[in-house]
């Protein structure tokens, strides 16, 4: 895979292509989209930190993936930015 060619692909195509590589799954591909390709509208529902932050923020006990995805829809087109803020809040112990 030529990583430079991924810049022009959709998020789902990038995830699909990277996931073909051994040891790379959806979460890693989503982090690549956010960190390397600077995509602003990625939400990684499988990220443990985001799940914990959203449970705290929205006072949820055991939300499903669908619940979290639906809540994150309100953050479009900046779901990556919202995610960065939630990670920062966790890192700084602003939320439990």
Segments from the language model and where they lie:
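Catalytic cores of DNA base-excision repair glycosylases
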Residues: 1-96
């Amino acid at each position: 895979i030529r990583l430079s060619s991924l810049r022009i692909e959709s998020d789902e195509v990038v995830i699909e292509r990277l996931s073909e590589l051994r040891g790379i799954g959806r979460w890693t591909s989503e982090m690549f989209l956010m960190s390397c390709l600077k995509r602003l509208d990625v939400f990684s529902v499988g990220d443990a930190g985001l799940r914990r932050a959203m449970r705290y923020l929205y006072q949820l006990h055991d939300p499903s993936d669908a619940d979290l995805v639906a809540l994150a829809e309100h953050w479009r087109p900046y779901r990556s930015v919202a995610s960065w803020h939630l990670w920062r809040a966790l890192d700084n112990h602003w939320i439990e």
